[in-house]
């Protein structure tokens, strides 16, 4: 089973956003999300939380491509919103800036269908080596 199917079958947010994985290679990821009215705020522009969630997925996939541990979690995510986004589909690219033993730093860009930069982010993902993060008792 490929990564696209694994995430669609095991991550409800990934499935809700209709994320499509376009590319994943060491230190890099590229995903796409559609424009949907359900994702928009007043004025029919993409909601900032949707943008941040897509950015988190792209950064997480870039991290996964270099993760030599068992699991990972987002430790920090800083997003600068530059332009309102309403021309989908949207592409989100994550590039690993630095990989350490316990942390991976990723720069992420969010663009519209015309290539216009709508948001830029810098995130830190914590590498977990001894367990998988899950709900207690579940």
Swiss-Prot record:
SUPFAM superfamilies, per database record? Thioesterase/thiol ester dehydrase-isomerase (SSF54637)
Keywords from UniProt, A to Z, are: Hydrolase
The GO terms this record gives for MF are: fatty acyl-CoA hydrolase activity
Q: Which domain of life is it from?
A: Archaea
InterPro entries membership: ACOT13 (IPR039298), HotDog_dom_sf (IPR029069), PAAI_dom (IPR003736), Thioestr_dom (IPR006683)
Record EC number: 3.1.2.-
Q: What is the enzyme's main class?
A: hydrolase
Q: Name one Pfam family in it.
A: 4HBT
Similarity comment text for this entry: Belongs to the thioesterase PaaI family.
* Protein name (record): Putative esterase STK_00610
């Amino acid at each position: 089973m490929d990564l696209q199917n694994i995430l669609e079958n095991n991550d409800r947010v990934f499935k809700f956003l209709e994320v499509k994985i376009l590319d994943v290679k060491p230190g890099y990821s590229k995903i796409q999300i559609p424009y949907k009215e359900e994702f928009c705020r007043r004025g029919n522009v993409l909601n900032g939380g949707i943008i941040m969630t897509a950015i988190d997925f792209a950064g997480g996939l870039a991290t996964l491509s270099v993760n030599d541990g068992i699991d990972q979690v987002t430790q920090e995510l800083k997003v600068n919103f530059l332009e309102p986004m309403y021309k989908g589909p949207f592409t989100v690219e994550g590039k690993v800036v630095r990989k350490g033993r316990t942390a991976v730093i990723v720069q992420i860009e969010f663009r519209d269908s015309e290539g216009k930069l709508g948001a830029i982010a810098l995130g830190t993902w914590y590498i977990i080596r001894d367990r998988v993060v899950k709900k207690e008792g579940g």
